[in-house]
């Protein structure tokens, strides 16, 4: 069989760099199309589109796509979501104070909207490639 390891090295981190790396690396899905056409794999291993966004509570407000300054003061970090609306990773750090249930619900809703927007862009790019 074939093993594919996808690695993203972040040379200079700033705000949502980690989440951007996760989303950008998904573009390697094009590799699987090529392997399918060449008969090297029988089935596309990609189970779902996914994307990652940074989010956090800054100054009592839920924010999406944090810059470095916001990220350094935020109460939460990131969400990786799927096309079907599932969450494959959620990082929360209540470093300055705990995140409330209301804030968490608001962050998840905000993040899912951001993930859906990124996935729509991924689909468009992959369809045009």
Annotated model-derived regions:
Residues 1-129:
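Polyanion-binding surfaces on beta-sheet-dominated domains and ring/shell assemblies
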């Amino acid at each position: 069989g074939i093993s594919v390891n996808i690695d993203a090295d972040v040379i200079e981190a700033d705000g949502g760099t980690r989440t951007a790396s996760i989303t950008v690396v998904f573009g390697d899905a094009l590799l699987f199309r090529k392997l399918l056409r060449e008969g090297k794999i029988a089935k596309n291993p990609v189970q779902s589109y996914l994307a990652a966004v940074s989010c956090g509570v800054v100054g009592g407000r839920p924010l999406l796509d944090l810059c470095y300054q916001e990220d350094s003061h935020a109460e939460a970090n990131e969400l990786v979501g799927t096309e079907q609306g599932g969450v494959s990773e959620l990082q929360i750090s209540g470093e300055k104070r705990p995140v409330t249930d209301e804030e968490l619900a608001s962050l998840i809703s905000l993040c899912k909207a951001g993930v859906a927007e990124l996935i729509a862009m991924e689909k468009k790019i992959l369809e045009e490639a």
